Amino acid sequence: MRGGRDVVAPGGRLAPVWDLRRDGFTLIEGLVERRELPAVRAEVERVLAGPLPPGCERPHNTLAPLAWDAPIVERLLASRERRRVLAGALAAQDLRWISGYVSVKDPRSEALEWHQDWWCWDHPVSFSEEPAQVAVLVYLSDTSSRTAALRVKPGTHRGGATDRTVTLAVRAGDAVACDYRLLHGTHPNESDARRDCLILNFAPAWSALPDDIRAHLIRHPALPAHGDDELLPDYEGEPRDLVLNRLAPAT
């Protein structure tokens, strides 16, 4: 495909094109089955009915944090088959869950601006071939350029500059996995309906991460103090906080 904007239609007919390592994102069709969606949506309503911690609302987007013991996280990750699909899509060597969110685009809300989620640009791991963290965005409704579909700039996870934009119009139950370093945003939500998305954040190769990155991530408040699930990260050293830097170096 050449420059400009490519639109992936519902059904993911172009899905084989996108590779997480090469492009910085990939499409996972039907990660959540249609029959599961009503129960998942009901869980989302329960989450949003409660009080949100400070800082959850940002321009044109609300994020409600999810802990490991949240029923909606358990519902999504209890399935061994779903875990297998996730590990395969992420080419994971040692998949571990780090955190989760409900992401809301309100009706008639503006586009979410271009940004990157990576938080430690001063660290050498930022320039690794492999992603240190991946966000899996699970959509609970169909999306389009009118209903806050995700927009991405392929290759920007490796510092490349591009004017090429891909719009990922997906079906309810589909997911998009994004390298934390990828430039991404959304279209506006021009509809009268809310656009809900679940974000599940993973380290695809936990044991291969630098010690100080693991020492920082193990402190994430979404993680339980103790747990023996194979998706939970483990760390035997002293937890520590790294200096955050969310500003990628100029290219």
Descriptions of predicted regions:
Residues R2, H157-T251:
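Conserved double-stranded beta-helix
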Residues R2-R22, E29-P124:
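Non-heme Fe(II)-dependent double-stranded beta-helix
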Residues G24-F25, G173:
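Catalytic palm active-site di-aspartate
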Residues L27-G30, R96-I98, A149-V152, A177-C178:
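A structural signal for short, well-ordered beta-strand segments and their strand-loop junctions
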Residues E33-R34, V102-K105, W119, T143-S145, ...:
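Short, solvent-exposed loop/turn segments at secondary-structure junctions
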Residues S99-V102, V136-V138, L198-F202:
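A structural signal for short, well-ordered beta-strand segments
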Residues R108-V170, A208-H216:
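Catalytic core of non-heme Fe(II) oxygenases with the double-stranded beta-helix
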